[in-house]
A protein has these predicted regions:
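Extracytoplasmic/periplasmic solute-binding protein
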Residues: 158-167, 172, 197-249, 266, ...
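Short, low-complexity disordered leader/linker segments with a strong preference
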Residues: 1-61, 81, 138, 449-465
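Short, well-ordered beta-strand elements
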Residues: 55-67, 86-91, 113-114, 163, ...
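Glycine-centered hinge/linker elements that transmit conformational signals in sensory
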Residues: 200-201, 246-279
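Conserved C-terminal helix/tail region of periplasmic/extracytoplasmic solute-binding proteins
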Residues: 37, 47, 87, 182, ...
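C-terminal lobe and pocket-closing loops
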Residues: 53, 304-315, 328-431, 463
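Extracytoplasmic "Venus flytrap"/periplasmic binding protein-like
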Residues: 77-148, 157, 179-191, 288-297, ...
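Hinge/lid segment of periplasmic solute-binding proteins
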Residues: 44, 49-53, 119-172, 197, ...
């Protein structure tokens, strides 16, 4: 009966969980090249302090979404050369199909051994017993966890246990065109929403932009609610900006951070500072519009900075900068994608557990004191990461310094927070919330009515579970 229930649950959650996802790097960075031969970090020896080698031959499948497959295969080849008793068979699915495919495999009792996971699916998959906690079986995970940005560790933790080692992690960043900002007479980006309003108003008055602010807040954009939540987090010191410890809505209280953001959004929209097209804009069009100089301010996943500042991409290449999220706390949303293993590994016995842990050490952990594979993704493909020591790595600084300010990137990572309320019903509620936020911005309902409707929907879905 439990399996049938899970299968039914999976179908009901199908569309909502996909749409709530932030797709990078499943579909990003937009212009990420196929991997070339890795720099020195790629050809590393076996991980130190690894679990005992498998006694016999072990073959495991590894399921990923379709991004950077050349790099993944090359990393597998290197891992197998160092661990000749272990064979890894790679299988990939598109990001758009990934969640449903994995859920279908799990519900049919045909899971992979190893796979990519995500913070917004962890509650669903771990509560069903499909994934197993890595810190229970792999001795080095605790050491890795101590060096991971808090938001990423939180995103890989369920019921106090760690279920992943980070493959990719990123933050929602406040970005601005420094050349246009200076044209408006400002030398520093806004630190608060009031300053952002003032600067945008001046830029419009001087004819720098018709609409100084642009967001990619189409209801189909997974990054839309994360960007909105980042603004909310930035207005509050500490947690529980959205939900309290009992998962009760906190966002619809008088004077809440969410209410402040909704009122501000309504103001900048009604005064012509926020481009009305924001409510139907997709991320790719957001990047193009910013490159064309049509707007000065935006919020987007950090990986877009590499595309914005790509040489010869436009008149403003090299002029885009990252600022802290405007607000008293400057907190933002961070998200994580990670390597995970299923119960199938444990059921297969000690040799498989040992091999899987060696895999985790090599792909998401350290090799001779270096996060080898994570560093390779960062240097070659510009992917964000959660392993804080890499911010001090000379190769990473050189690579990221081509399109961003590394100290600011690190500061965002340390202040970022995982989304609140990541439950099995979060995805479907998230879809509902997107429409309500837009109604509030458009003035179709008051800010508090929109937030109250979001709270009522949350309570309804929570009760149904």
């Amino acid at each position: 009966m439990r399996t049938k229930f899970l299968a039914l649950l999976s179908v009901l959650m199908l569309a909502s969980m996909l749409l709530s996802a932030c797709g990078a790097p499943a579909a990003a960075p937009p212009a990420a090249p196929a991997a070339t031969e890795a720099p020195a970090a790629a050809g590393a020896p076996a991980a130190t302090e690894a679990p005992a080698a498998a006694a016999g031959p072990v073959t495991m499948d590894f399921v990923v979404w379709s991004y950077g497959l050349d790099t993944i295969n090359d990393n597998i080849k290197k891992f197998e050369a160092l661990n000749p008793s272990v064979t890894i068979n790679l299988k990939d699915y598109s990001w758009l199909d990934y969640h449903d495919t994995i859920v279908g495999l799990m519900a049919a009792n045909n899971p992979p051994y190893l796979l990519y996971g995500s913070d917004h699916w962890l509650n669903e998959w771990a509560s069903a017993g499909w994934l197993v906690p890595l810190d229970k079986y792999c001795p080095n995970v605790a050491g890795y966890s101590s060096e991971v940005a808090p938001y990423a560790l939180q995103g890989m933790t369920y019921n106090g246990e760690v279920y992943g080692v980070s493959y990719y992690a990123d933050t929602q960043d406040f970005m601005y065109n420094d050349a246009l900002l200076k044209k408006g007479g400002f030398t520093a980006p806004p630190a608060t929403l009031d300053e952002l309003y003032t600067q945008a108003k001046e830029l419009k008055a001087k004819g720098v932009n018709e609409f100084p602010i642009l967001f990619a807040w189409s209801q189909k954009e997974g990054a839309y609610p994360e960007a909105w939540t980042s603004l909310v987090f930035a207005q509050q010191q500490g947690p529980n900006a959205m939900f309290d410890a009992n998962l009760e809505p906190a966002f619809n209280k008088d004077g809440s951070a969410a209410f402040q953001v909704m009122e501000w959004l309504r103001k900048v929209y009604s005064e012509g500072l926020l481009d009305p097209a924001s409510l139907s804009t997709a991320e790719i069009d957001q990047v193009k519009a910013m490159q064309a100089g049509a707007h000065t301010f935006t919020i987007a996943p950090q990986y877009n900075m590499a595309e914005l500042n790509k040489p010869a991409s436009g008149d403003f290449a090299g002029q885009f900068k990252i600022g802290l999220m405007p607000g008293p706390s400057h907190a933002t949303v961070g998200y994580v994608r990670f390597y995970a293993m299923t119960q199938k590994v444990v059921d297969a016995g000690p040799d498989y557990i040992a091999a899987a842990c060696k895999f985790m050490d090599y792909f998401g952990g350290k090799t001779d004191g270096v996060y080898t594979v994570v560093k390779r993704w960062a240097v070659e493909n510009g992917l964000g990461f959660a392993q804080l020591p890499l911010f001090d790595d000379a190769d990473v600084i050189a690579a990221f310094g081509k399109w961003g300010d590394v100290p600011t990137i690190k500061e965002n990572a340390t202040m970022a927070r995982s989304k609140e309320g990541l439950t099995t019903w979060y995805g479907s509620w998230d879809i509902f919330a997107r429409a309500e936020i837009q109604k509030g911005i458009l003035g179709q309902e008051s800010s508090m009515d929109a937030l109250n409707n979001m709270a009522a929907e949350w309570d309804k879905e929570k009760a149904a579970k």
